[in-house]
Every structure is written in structure tokens, then in C-alpha cells.
UniProtKB/Swiss-Prot annotation:
Keywords: Acyltransferase, Fatty acid metabolism, Lipid metabolism, Peroxisome, Transferase, Transit peptide. GO terms for molecular function: acetyl-CoA C-acyltransferase activity. It catalyses: an acyl-CoA + acetyl-CoA = a 3-oxoacyl-CoA + CoA. CDD domains: thiolase. This is 3-ketoacyl-CoA thiolase, peroxisomal. It comes from the Eukaryota. Belongs to the thiolase-like superfamily. Thiolase family. Its main location: other. GO terms for biological process: fatty acid beta-oxidation; phenylacetate catabolic process. InterPro entries: Thiolase, Thiolase-like, Thiolase-like_sf_Thiolase, Thiolase_acyl_enz_int_AS, Thiolase_AS, Thiolase_C, Thiolase_CS, Thiolase_N. Pathway: Lipid metabolism; fatty acid metabolism.
């Protein structure tokens, strides 16, 4: 049974994902990425920007500059000055958490229409600067927060028996799926073409033809005997994403088609050295809270930080690869960290629509320093007026 008070998604769009420092989006500032995503979703849905009551965007690699960039980009997209804008930073989970925050504001009645999303120009910042603290302190878990994501992925892979060949095979599969989806036009509905200079950019730049033979000779990045290489790890990227949510009643009044219903969001903590298993903990807790089993979920999008990391998650969750990341993931598409959480919502809903998957879909990411996030959506083929409760 559906209700007029349900929180629903009426649009989920993103920019193409550019390769950081050398891609076609490298000349764009953060605020320009924001403008592209927000303007794109306003134009695609046809919503009057004056109806948007709040904007929350995920962003990671800056604080003050990010807040200013978000505000500038949103204003330039046509959203009025009266609409408040803020950024949040839960690292790779930021974009998905923004969706959860806007949804909860709508559910609580504080707003009726809101925009979520995320942005990141990793070109602008490159790799985060390393810092050190003395090891062997009083709190081992606190010290483990300094572990790089690659180190954590290597440890998880070793613990769960992920081999180099398995990681490479997964990476090749991700690239092949993304390339096939691109050729078939499956991303067209979620990507906002961008005019950069004299060129229109409308494809993700990280997707490429590859094979085991071309990547098996690459050297490990984090350990000499490790499994993580530049080919089976996510890419540094530039991009932005946007998700428009509102009450179902408002969608009906505005004549906007419902893409999916937002059900729930969760953030969890776990040992920092187990960070890569964040999706396992988050998904299991999310499903339990909503009285669901994994076999009741039609489809999963789990962010591909590293092939070894996502393989560990699939093994722990006991989910077949055919139910996950059918159009590839961050290994192929790229990982603009502040935007990726909302990006996987875009792709989750694209897959479910294109593949005619009804029922529940889950989006999830691992998050640095020992966290995981997950969100639950429901997609139906349609509803009749008598199916709607006047609540």
C-alpha cells in the first residue's frame, strides 16, 4: 500500500565522470560541477526551482571552499537565495547520506521538496596529504583510523582469501559491464551532457576496453605481495550528482512521475581496519530494521572502492554477482568521492528501470575510518488511484 505522504524520488541525474588531473572535466571548478548537476535535474524534471526548500550536498576534500562552491553552484543553477544550502562530509558515503538527510526532513514535515547529491573535483586536490601519529597508543582502533583504504583492502583480501587473479577478474568484469552499458545507451537517462570548451562531454572517461592479459602484469600499489593495483582499484575522478525528492502528494500535484520510493537510510560504525566491510554491516542492519531478507532485494549497488574489498562484501553477504553492479562500478566509471553515494543511487534506479526490476533496491558504500552506509528504495511498475491511502 502506498501513501500520499511517502517520500519519493522524481529525478536522479549526474554529470559524466571525468578522470582527475587529465580528463575533460579537469578545468572545471567544484561550483561548476555543482551547477551542471543541479541545473540538469531542474531542466530534466521541469520543477520550478523556487519550490526547492533545501539543498544538501556531499563533499569531502575541502570544508570552507566546499561550502562556498556548493552555494555558488546552486545559485548559478537558478535556485533562489532563500533556499539554504549545506555540505556534509562522511567521506565516500557523503552523497548517499545527503539523500537520507533530505528524505528524513521531508518525512518529518519540515520540508516537502528537497535536493540531495554530491560533488568532487579530485583534480583540485589530488591525493590527500599524509600525516602520522605515534603508533601503539592507548587506543588501537583510533590509531587504525590512519590506515589507508588500500591497506585496509589488502588486509581484508588476505583474511578472506581474495587472490590477485580474482581481483583482476572482477575489475575486468566491471569494465566490460560498464562498456556494454555505455554502448547500449543505458547511462543516457542518468548522465547530463556537459559543454566544456568546444566539446560536449557525455560519457564516463574511466571506461575502457581491457582484459586479464593487459592488467595482470601491473605491480601492486600498497604491498609488494598485495592484490590491489591501479586497474582493480577505483579511480580518482571529477563529477557531481543530484537527486530530487519530495512527498508523493507533491509529485502528483506537480505531475512528476515517481522514479522510486525512498524507504530508509542507515549509517553504521565498525573497526577501522574492517572499513571495507561497512556495506555488509550496513545492509544487514538496514534489512533487519525493515523486516526484510536479502533474497527479497531485487538489486544491489555496492560501491567498488577496490575489487578485493567488494569481493569480500559479496562473500560475506552471499550475494551473487548477477544481482550487483550490472553496469559496472567505480573501478570502471570512477569515484568522485563526494558524489559517488548519490551517483550509485542514479545507477541503481537506472538499472532497475532498464531491466524492469520491481520491488526493493539497495545502495551501499564503505566509508573510511570504519563506517558503512546503505539506503533502501522501492520501485513499482505503477499504481492505481485506489492503491493510494489518503494519509
Amino acid at each position: 500500500m502506498i501513501s500520499h505522504e511517502d517520500v519519493v524520488v522524481v529525478g536522479a541525474l549526474r554529470t559524466p565522470i571525468g578522470r582527475a588531473t587529465r580528463g575533460k572535466l579537469r578545468s572545471l571548478r567544484n561550483d561548476e560541477l555543482v551547477t551542471a548537476a543541479i541545473r540538469g535535474i531542474i531542466e530534466k524534471t521541469g520543477i520550478d526551482p523556487r519550490l526547492i526548500e533545501e539543498v544538501i550536498l556531499g563533499h569531502c576534500l575541502s570544508s570552507m571552499e566546499g561550502n562556498v562552491a556548493a552555494r555558488m553552484g546552486v545559485l548559478r543553477a537558478g535556485v533562489p537565495v532563500e533556499t539554504p544550502v549545506m555540505i556534509i562530509n562522511r567521506l565516500c558515503g557523503s552523497g548517499l547520506e545527503s539523500v537520507g538527510l533530505i528524505a528524513e526532513k521531508i518525512r518529518s514535515g519540515r520540508i516537502e521538496i528537497g535536493l540531495a547529491g554530491g560533488f568532487e573535483s579530485m583534480t583540485s586536490y589530488g591525493l590527500p596529504k599524509e600525516y602520522t601519529l605515534s603508533r601503539g597508543g592507548a587506543c588501537e582502533d583510533a590509531e587504525d583510523c590512519m590506515l589507508t583504504l588500500g591497506e585496509v583492502s589488502e588486509m581484508l583480501g588476505k583474511t578472506h582469501g581474495v587472490t590477485r587473479s580474482e581481483a583482476d577478474e572482477y575489475a575486468v568484469t566491471s569494465q566490460k559491464r560498464a562498456l556494454e552499458a555505455t554502448k547500449k545507451g543505458h547511462f543516457l537517462a542518468e548522465i547530463i551532457p556537459m559543454r566544456v570548451g568546444d566539446e560536449t562531454v557525455e560519457r564516463d572517461e574511466g571506461i575502457r576496453e581491457t582484459s586479464l592479459g593487459t592488467i595482470e602484469s601491473l605491480k601492486p600499489v600498497f604491498r609488494q605481495d598485495g592484490v590491489c593495483t591501479s586497474a582493480n582499484s577505483s579511480q580518482l575522478s571529477d563529477g557531481a550528482s543530484a537527486v530530487l525528492l519530495m512527498k508523493r502528494r507533491r509529485a502528483d500535484e506537480l505531475g512528476l512521475p515517481v522514479v522510486a520510493e525512498f524507504i530508509d537510510f542507515i549509517a553504521v560504525g565498525l573497526k577501522p581496519r574492517d572499513m571495507g566491510l561497512g556495506p555488509v554491516v550496513a545492509i544487514e542492519k538496514l534489512l533487519k530494521r525493515n523486516g526484510l531478507e536479502k533474497d527479497q532485494i531485487s538489486y544491489f549497488e555496492i560501491n567498488e572502492a577496490f575489487a578485493s574489498q567488494v569481493l569480500c562484501c559479496l562473500r560475506k553477504l552471499q550475494i551473487g554477482e548477477d544481482r550487483v553492479n550490472r553496469y559496472g562500478g567505480s573501478i570502471a566509471l570512477g569515484h568522485p568521492i563526494g558524489a559517488s553515494g548519490a551517483r550509485i543511487v542514479c545507477t541503481l534506479l537506472s538499472v532497475m528501470k532498464n531491466e524492469a526490476l520491481e520491488g526493493y533496491g539497495v545502495a551501499s558504500l564503505c566509508v573510511g575510518a570504519g563506517h558503512g552506509v546503505a539506503a533502501l528504495f522501492r520501485r513499482a511498475a505503477g499504481s492505481k488511484p485506489q492503491d493510494i491511502k489518503n494519509t
